[in-house]
Amino acid sequence: MNHYIRTIGSMLILVYSMLAAFLFIDKVFVNIIYFQGMFYTQIFGIPVFLFLNLIIILLCIIVGSVLAYKINQQNDWIKTQIERSMEGETVGINDQNIEIYSETLDLYHTLVPLNQELHKLRLKTQNLTNENYNINDVKVKKIIEDERQRLARELHDSVSQQLFAASMMLSAIKETKLEPPLDQQIPILEKMVQDSQLEMRALLLHLRPLGLKDKSLGEGIKDLVIDLQKKVPMKVVHEIQDFKVPKGIEDHLFRITQEAISNTLRHSNGTKVTVELFNKDDYLLLRIQDNGKGFNVDEKLEQSYGLKNMRERALEIGATFHIVSLPDSGTRIEVKAPLNKEDSYDD
């Protein structure tokens, strides 16, 4: 813009210099008709000298108005670029059809790095937000896990022990000679206590699931089955093939196994549960099957938290999750997870 201002100033200086020269010549050469006519002839009743000044002033006003319009265009464009920058958009110079002054370009070249820095700050803010979300998610999960552990300890130390004591007392009472109707009621009470103990063990397994730690999936399932065989009246058996399972899916499969056994203990009313794990070359098959009362899959699948949790865990590892259950014929849960041969045998 400076070169426009300098041009106007130079033009004014030139015109007034010429007028001064004409005036000087008029004083010296008063007999020259041209200069006399120049300074004494009138146009529209206005001396030529004054008329020329008015023309020059009018031209300056017109040129100044044009420059002011262009400057306003520059300011509007810069304002738009700043607003776009504040909104996170990338500013550019290719989307406008106005003439850019050197001063505006200087300001624009200052704005571009600021826009880039602002974009970086926005990305950092998003990353921090995501990190905070992940941290909060981990904290929430940790709080939930701690609360589950606390509830499991309280149930084990109080209710579970009381149920055990009640079971022992009822067993001792059964050894004595009972008169009717106690001889019929005591066995019923004993059965109720045993069912409560079974329900309690299933709840404890759900609230305080065992981790694999340094064990493989097969070893973890075997240890789980052996532990349950000592604590529950239901027959728990396993058939586990010895093969390497990718670390990324082992924990999910183990938690699915725990959840399935817990549901079986609590709801199946069966006498036997079987856990099977097979290597089918390109996929593994995990199957948990019982001989209980069965249920309507369509009704239970959306209502049961345990079933939905198992299905979600299977989907997270790219596995398929199927349930087959028939009334009085038991329930079979199958999980098929794809195996990557290279990952399966990596240490």
UniProtKB/Swiss-Prot annotation:
Pfam families: HATPase_c, HisKA_3. GO terms for cellular component: plasma membrane. The chain crosses the membrane at residues 13-33, 43-63. Changing H156A: Complete loss of phosphorylation. Its EC number is 2.7.13.3. Induction: Induced by antibiotics (teicoplanin, ceftizoxime, imipenem, bacitracin, D-cycloserine and vancomycin). The modification Phosphohistidine is found at H156. It catalyses: ATP + protein L-histidine = ADP + protein N-phospho-L-histidine. GO terms for molecular function: ATP binding; phosphorelay sensor kinase activity; protein dimerization activity. Disulfide bonds: none annotated. Member of the two-component regulatory system PprA/PprB involved in biofilm formation by controlling the expression of many related genes including type IVb pili major subunit flp pilin, adhesin bapA or cupE fimbriae. Also modulates quorum-sensing signal production acting on both negative and positive modulators. Functions as a heme sensor histidine kinase which is autophosphorylated at a histidine residue and transfers its phosphate group to PprB. This is Sensor protein VraS. It comes from Staphylococcus aureus (strain N315).
